[in-house]
Amino acid sequence: MGYPEASVLVIMGVPLFSGFMYASVGSYIARVIRIFDIRFTPYPPFWTTVVLAIAIYVNFVAHHFVPDIRLILFAATVILLGRTMVRFTLGRRYGFPLPLAALIVSFFLWLAENISTLTGTWTYAGSPPFDWTSLQKMGSWYLLIYVAFVTVTLVIRAPLDIKDNRAISKS
């Protein structure tokens, strides 16, 4: 089991928590959307991204008890959001695909996590000191970015170029 420590809020042995780094990802996304005037175009029907985020979150918890569908979720992010361009201003307008943006951010989160574990700032139970975290953690960060991103878009909808009238209402 990946969570040997005692916890106050637990479902089937998996702690429910939102740690500093997890909350920071959502805060970072909200902030850079505003700072760099980011637009996401074309954006798929909003409800589909909500379903994807829910599936990712459920897999984070359930993969300890049922088959892990992470590879399917990776593919779903590319299929659903592969055409979505992240358009931002940094002197002039630039853009690249949303999955590439998520991959870049997940790499830097993984790097920060490794720096934290190598310096002893953060440790995992059962891991030796100064242990390098696996690339699987980068995959987890990649998926977490979509959960955080969709959570932010529940509040900040303006940057999304949604072409679907059935999108979840803002109220």
Which functions belong to the PLM regions below?
Residues M1-S171:
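Aromatic-rich, lipid-facing transmembrane alpha helices and their immediate juxtamembrane interface loops
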